[in-house]
Each structure stands twice: as structure tokens, then as C-alpha cells.
């Protein structure tokens, strides 16, 4: 089942990275991603009922990476800023930022439609190139 999702571009991911780096970054083997909140329509326009959505993995765009331990260095290319990650439904922890941070940098981002999540690289199921 493929969701009809729209992800932020790699260029916007890099802008977000620059804006957020002044505030800090994920610790150790973690990554900050930005995901669309509403993931209820599959390709073809079929609406997915609430219970069925619980079984689907989440996807999001990498914004920031923490410092990888030696044993996780091989993840480096898989979690570079702008890549799209697939991760489990219950993986990660949502985190909120003040929208003014982005406005000051001239970044237009609708936080009602997007969410930030920090997850461990162990929770990543799949990594793909972002063609946006």
C-alpha cells in the first residue's frame, strides 16, 4: 500500500537544518526528521480508515543527525539531510519547535501539517532519495 504523501524538498530540509543547528541537535545515534501529519490517502485517492493506518509505517525527511558511534558510521549516507526515511509506527518521539524560529529565517513551514520526530537509527526501516 503506497501513501500519496508530499515531502519537503532537500533544499528546504537544508534550510531547516541550518535554522535548527543553533538550537542543538539529536544526541548519539539519533536523527531528527520532518513528516507530514495526515497520512490517510493512498495512491489512487482511497481513504484509509483510522485503524488501518496504525499498521502502516511512517515516512519523513531527514533534517539533522546526531553524532554516530563507530558501530553506526555505515548509516552516514543513509541519513544525510534531505533523504526520506521509513520507520515503524511507534518509533521515535515527537518534538515541537517554536514557529518563530523558522519565520526569522524566512522559512515557510506549516506546523499544523508537519511534525518533527527524533528517532534512533535502529528504528529506520528504509532510506530513499528525495526527488523533490
Question: What are the residue ranges of the model-derived segments?
Answer:
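Compact, glycine-rich, soluble single-domain proteins
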Residues: 2-132
